[in-house]
Amino acid sequence: MRGKQVFMESLIAHGVEYIFGNPGTTESPILDALLDYPQLRYVVALHEGVALGAASYYAQTSGKTGVVNIHVAPGLGNALGMLYNALKARSPLVVTAGQQDTRLRLRGPVLGHDLVAMAAPLTKWSVQVERADEFALIMHRALKIATDPPAGPVFVGLPIDVLEQETDGEPLSPGRLYRAPEPAPAGVQAAAELLLGSQRPAIVVGDDAVSAAADVAALAEHLGAAVWCEGIRTFQVLPSGHPNFRLGLPFDTVAIRKALDGVDVALLVGGPFFEEVWYAPGSPLPSGARAIHVESSPERLAHNLAVSVGLVSHPRAALSALRTAVDRGASPAFREAAARRNDALRALKAQDGEAQRARAAKRWDNAPISVPRLMAEIELALPPDAIVVDESITAGPDLARTVQFEHAGDYVGARGGGIGQALPGALGVKLAHPDRPVVALSGDGSAMYSIQALWTAAHHDLAVVFVILNNREYRILKHNMDTYRQRFGAKPDRGYPNMDLVSPDLGFVEIARGLGVEGLRVSKPGELRPALEKALGAGRPFLLDVAIEGRA
């Protein structure tokens, strides 16, 4: 058996179905071997960032390990931005790259570099196979480490000569690994006592809580607690319409503290807590608030905050145990107070809905199209089982307040914050859920980072609807320029240099056509609904270039 065969059969043994890649010469052994392993499907991308982004979203939404194969040092360099996002999203990925013949190492070969060192800062483990006899163990370990909590990408370098070496090694079986720890009973009791003594509890959920969505909802209702998501997230854990759900937190300490004003006990579940953009001193939690942190890996427990109680546990196990302990210890007075808190949250939810509908009505006929109108039309047009891949950035608050996501997997965000994720990400989501409609929402600036994804959609016949929110600018940068000038005392009202995407305008319909995808320009509000209906009914990749309002 050759090294390339051990590589391929290791993937199959671990349930891998897709290899996402952009081929190169050093990957020739793998590409050639694919002819002998038809159960592995190669998803071709025209840029390594697209391949890695698609694989990351596939891994996040399928529950399976994503595998990427890219080309030597320049290819890995092209993929590093998406690799950063995958690390932040904790995507279980095995990223591989072909490497030049090891016998050329000292001669400085074309395209050669230290791939292990390049990948190391953005991976859980980075290694190169030096002999074919190492293949079985390295692949077994790579596929395990990628899925060990906290999940994340690993890197394996594949020299072309080692892929062709003979070996007696055979792929190792993954086995059944039971890795979901139960919370310590003493910790559960301590956390329950804090919650039962709270006058205004709140729950903040990270992406790891998605597997415990029902438990989050049940505990929130038991406590009468508001539930917040992190500002940048992959998943929306609770349904949009759940009365306790308060959407996403902002990105600086002062604003987070304001959102959580009055909270005396915060239960933080399955996330790093908190990711900020702007510095401010002090804790994100209100003065005097106590924190309980549930985390599946010790390394992230109490990492950024001092907590009163920390539990290393699978979120589902911890929340189930907490709910039982709270239910057992709740007094009649606590239950009455929790019911009042739930009533108040329900009323606040209704007020928020009315406010958003009024916001949309006020700007319903605006041209360029208002963002609230666009989101309202999307909500009306979406099939009930649709998945939205969101990189709408400044349009995100209107999306969150308007579109009703009923299940945790209905919304997939752009964790990490590096732009260009939605277009390739939607490809991975569609491969993970081929029977569900998938709609990608992307700003115009973000789309241009990974526009080659349209070709992959056409090439593999992936019926994704790509909606480009085209405001002809980097709107988020204009908002952040205002914030910068205010925070650092710079002169205001000096304009926004190099933040407009004009002269020439970006022609997304023309670009899409050149990449094999039909497109339609939407510039008037009345055109939105028929355009969305056409795109969603096309049964093939389709792009809508929607002219929306700019900075407001």
Language-model features: locations:
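N-terminal alpha/beta PP-like core and its mobile active-site loop of ThDP/TPP-dependent enzymes
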Residues: M1-P332, E336, A381-P384, A463-F466, ...
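Active-site diphosphate/adenylate-binding microenvironment
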Residues: K4-M8, I12-E17, N22-T25, I30-Y37, ...
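Hydrophobic, well-ordered secondary-structure segments
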Residues: V277-A280, L322-A330, E336-Q356, L423, ...
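Active-site/binding-pocket entry motifs
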Residues: V162, R233, T394-G396, G550
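Phosphate/pyrophosphate-binding active-site segments
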Residues: D133, G288-S392, K491-Y496, V517-G519, ...
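Thiamine diphosphate
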Residues: T96, L106-L111, H222, R257-L260, ...
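Conserved short loop/turn motifs at secondary-structure junctions
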Residues: G206-S211, R363, G443-G445
